[in-house]
Amino acid sequence: MTPSNATVHPAINFYHDLVHTGALAQDTWDVLEPGMQERLLNFGGRPLCTVLRPMLQTEADYAWLGARTSLMLSVFRKTSNALMRDAGLRAQMALTPDEEALVRIPTGYDTNIPTARLDSFFLRHADGSRTLNFIEFNGESPASMGYSDVLAELFLETPLMRRFQERYNARPIMARPYAADALLRIYAQWKGNSSDKPRMAIVDWADVPTTPEFTILANYFRTRGMTVVICTPDELDFVGGKLYAKGEFVDFVYKRVLTTELLQRYGLDHPMIDALRAGAVCIANPFTCKLLHKKASFAFVSDERNAHLFTAEEQAAVQLHIPWTRTVAERNTLDKHGARIDLLPWASHQRESLVLKPNDEYGGKGVLIGWETDQRTWDSALEAAIEDPAIIQERAEIAYEDFPRLDARGSVEMGQRLVDCDPFLFDGDTMGGCLVRLSTVTLLNVTAGGGSVVPLFVIREK
């Protein structure tokens, strides 16, 4: 048996040895490639996974990640509650007037974050120590819970994983059961009873690259007793006090469409919003999730102005796991060492250690990597950010691992990848699985192109 403090590296080395054994690599790709096609594992028409190895974590790794994530969840839960109570604090999020109107509409249940995802870099060092840097809070019904589950099921069918499991127990952490439990819980609270099941509409634009995942999720939710229709925002109608999707009555919206895009298209005049105001529909994630989804939420939790909201343990966790972050503004503040700084001149001078992110974008849009940007472009972006809200964030230590793939000739190629390990969050207090993304470029985002998703397996030597 592997002791609980054993590192994951021997298991990774064993897997890589198997990759170079006989035809295991080609035989595995011959399962993965058609399997992804058959099981809707594509993103905008591209295969979801391009490598031969999943992410491996020891039991101790996963337990440690869960404990640290839970502590940060406490911080964000307190943040969300404080922002809902205090309009003065809420101003730090730079909500638009329409967003402010939406967050004031009662949801009918008690959490602002029924589902979410914390994006992070999780490093496991050879000496057994670990480093964890959270970099973004995805609060708007985050993608990949369905993708990652089905990809894990597919990997379990591959020759490589079968040989690997001769030495190691390997269990996936499935996110869909956690998601269904969370959605059923808020629906029961909204409805006032737990006997009825949601009549759900999964709502997003028709041309989004994650459309295949909607079918994956719909199929699973149906096994949990829900009725599900997939539709666009244009296919919703609010008539006679009831919401309809493609003509079918629904009382639950699983809102995958981003709030910003909905408001850009319709303003506040949309059937979903009308139904919410009338108490005729339960929506997840709620519009209140926007408070944490804003990039400014990371500035909020790391800003000395707000430290009084958190316990000493929580403040220490923020310092340890949240890179120093500030909303771009003409102000004095404290740097990560506690020294007082004039923010804008300091940010200009510290370009090579900072990233600039728009307050409300996704898929890497508008992100400037300071150490990959010339000074003139950087300074112009800082100046623009005074009017168009953005944050600056300290450069986080990035996780790298080698992953094998087949090249065009069918030969095994080992390549270093940047690794994003993003815990899925439920009910505002529970971690249930992770999205793991790989990239060869600094801007680690599948939406931006060139990335790969792999499933996570928690392992223990037999």
Label each region the model flagged.
Residues 1-462:
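Preference for protein termini
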